[in-house]
Amino acid sequence: MRNIYLVGFMGSGKSTVGKLLAEKLGFRFVDIDQEIEKEEGKKIKDIFREKGESYFRDLEKRMIERFLGSKNLVVSTGGGLGADSENMRKMKENGTVIWLDTPLETVFERCKGDDERPLLKKNRKEIKELFEKRKKIYAQADIRISTEGKSPYQIVNEILGRIR
């Protein structure tokens, strides 16, 4: 079966849903952020601080390309990875892209107090602008799943119903 790529803003549940979905499908789960941390030997926030966002975005692109030729993967992308048109095109060519659409207020609630997310250092207005900009690219996904008011298990079951 083709790969499944989960896209969405930070805090949308990509990693949580991805692990559960991979388990249900018998697929391997890949978290791009974790793969980057493993390769760099540093936390994402430290990569951002030391080398900047554009360096990190290049790492994301290289990392996703590593998995494009594989099969039977559920891939949790970083929030910015799926917000790049070129990355979106490549993922769609290689698999099914699923957007976990989560309202911004829910994202704020889930992420408050999380100092591991460098983009939360921005003010609310900047985050809202980034959120709106990224939504336009996330909307190119093959499948949109609203996560509002749903448990990770409900989201996984909805995905399974849509991909089978």
Swiss-Prot record:
Class in the EC hierarchy, top level: transferase
Keyword Cytoplasm assigned: yes
GO cellular-component term (any): cytosol
PANTHER family in UniProt: SHIKIMATE KINASE, SHIKIMATE KINASE 1, CHLOROPLASTIC
Entry binding sites for ATP: 11-16, 117
EC number: 2.7.1.71
Species for this entry: Persephonella marina (strain DSM 14350 / EX-H1)
Protein's recorded name: Shikimate kinase
Molecular functions (GO terms): ATP binding; magnesium ion binding; shikimate kinase activity
Annotated positions binding substrate: 33, 57, 79, 134
Keyword Cytoplasm recorded: yes
Stretch forming the signal peptide: none
Catalyses which reaction(s): shikimate + ATP = 3-phosphoshikimate + ADP + H(+)
Cofactor: Mg(2+)
Self-association state and partner proteins as the record states: Monomer.
Main location: cytoplasm
Keywords annotated in UniProt: Amino-acid biosynthesis, Aromatic amino acid biosynthesis, ATP-binding, Cytoplasm, Kinase, Magnesium, Metal-binding, Nucleotide-binding, Transferase
